[in-house]
């Protein structure tokens, strides 16, 4: 169980899975609090995805609750950098390593939270519930961009 607006990523994953419309080589995971273990496995794997899209609810100064935006790994708020570390290696470090050392493009789609309650509370705030479709659109746009880039590469391969 996640804390209120911290359930934003799983809510987006659930809607994308229900909506469908992505190619067979795309996997949509509700990683919940297990994201570090998954990223660690990918870092150690010989076969890696071309792109990872992370969706999360964040608290970033100057943003309005419910605002959906893309953020660089380097610009993640301090309170998210060390979330639930795995062997003292924060998630952001794993994402950076996947990007810089493993050649995996990492995209972070975020929404400004209204608040994260201090205790377990089910459900998103109204602002974040309303942001789910916008985040889904951004993720689907990223997937479409990847697919068109693959088609362009394949289309150009046979031309001299």
Give the location of each predicted region.
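N-terminal catalytic or cofactor-binding beta/alpha core of small enzyme domains
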Residues: 1-104, 108-113, 122-133, 140-160
């Amino acid at each position: 169980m996640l804390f209120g607006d911290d359930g934003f990523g799983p809510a987006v994953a659930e809607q994308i899975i229900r909506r469908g419309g992505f190619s067979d080589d795309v996997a949509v995971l509700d990683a919940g609090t297990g994201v570090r273990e998954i990223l660690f496995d990918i870092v150690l794997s010989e076969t890696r995805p071309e792109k990872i899209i992370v969706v999360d609810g964040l608290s970033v100064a100057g943003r309005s609750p419910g605002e959906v935006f893309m953020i660089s790994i380097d610009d993640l708020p301090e309170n998210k950098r060390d979330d639930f570390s795995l062997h003292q290696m924060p998630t952001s470090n794993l994402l950076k390593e996947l990007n810089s050392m493993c050649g995996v493009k990492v995209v972070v789609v975020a929404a400004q939270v209204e608040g994260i309650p201090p205790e377990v509370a089910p459900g998103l705030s109204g602002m974040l519930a309303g942001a789910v479709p916008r985040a889904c659109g951004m993720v689907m746009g990223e997937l479409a961009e990847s697919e068109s880039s693959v088609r362009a590469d394949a289309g150009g391969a046979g031309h001299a």
